[in-house]
Curated annotation (Swiss-Prot):
The lineage of its organism: Bacteria, Pseudomonadati, Pseudomonadota, Gammaproteobacteria, Aeromonadales. It comes from the Bacteria. One of its GO terms (molecular function) is protein-disulfide reductase activity. SUPFAM superfamilies: DsbB-like. Residues 1-14, 66-72, 165-173 are cytoplasmic. The gene is dsbB. This is Disulfide bond formation protein B. One of its GO terms (cellular component) is plasma membrane. Its main location: membrane. Coiled coil: none annotated. It comes from Aeromonas salmonicida (strain A449). Belongs to the DsbB family.
């Protein structure tokens, strides 16, 4: 089983599936924004950035998964992005489930001055929605609740694949 897990991270197909799943989520977010007319809030924008981190990890892993340093860089980016995405989605769910004048998100994105993504790519990163508003549901779960499940799944798969790569084996030097 460990050998199988090590082999997964050493193949482009697995990294491609990771990138494709994140690309699907990004395209879905743009569909919700531009076709259905839902306005992204600050937390939505940050969650998009976390998904872009997972997408970037998948693309980095596809470059040369047999090279340990690229594989581990992709794994670390994947793990960090999934973890931060889960934190953000949980906080976003808290804003929605416990609305209060004292529990609100900022109306402005707080990107570093050296990377003002909301100014560089406003069509993707400009927030103009309300974090506590539930404007869409599927199977009675809001979008941030679905993102909790998605980021938790990304994190779980990351942990399993990473454990497989930490254990010494005969594969994938």
């Amino acid at each position: 089983m460990i050998e199988f897990l090590r082999r997964i991270a050493a193949h482009r197909l697995a990294w491609g599936l990771l990138a494709a799943s994140a690309l699907f989520l990004e395209l879905s977010a743009l569909f919700f924004q531009y076709v259905l007319g839902l306005h992204p809030c600050v937390m939505c924008v940050y969650e998009r950035l976390a998904i872009l981190g997972v997408l970037s990890a998948g693309l980095l892993g596809m470059v040369a998964p047999e090279k340990w340093y690229l594989r581990w860089s992709a794994l670390l980016l994947w793990g960090y992005s999934a973890f931060r995405g889960l934190q953000l989605a949980l906080k976003h769910v808290d804003y929605q489930m416990n609305p209060s004048p004292f529990n609100v998100c900022s109306p402005f994105a707080d990107f570093p001055s050296w990377a003002p993504l909301d100014q560089w790519l406003p069509w993707l990163f400009f927030p103009d929605g309300d974090c506590s508003e539930i404007s869409w549901q599927f199977l009675s779960f809001s979008m941030p609740q679905w993102l909790v499940a998605i980021f938790a799944a990304y994190l779980l798969v990351f942990v399993v694949v990473t454990i497989g790569n930490l254990v010494k084996g005969r594969c994938c030097s």
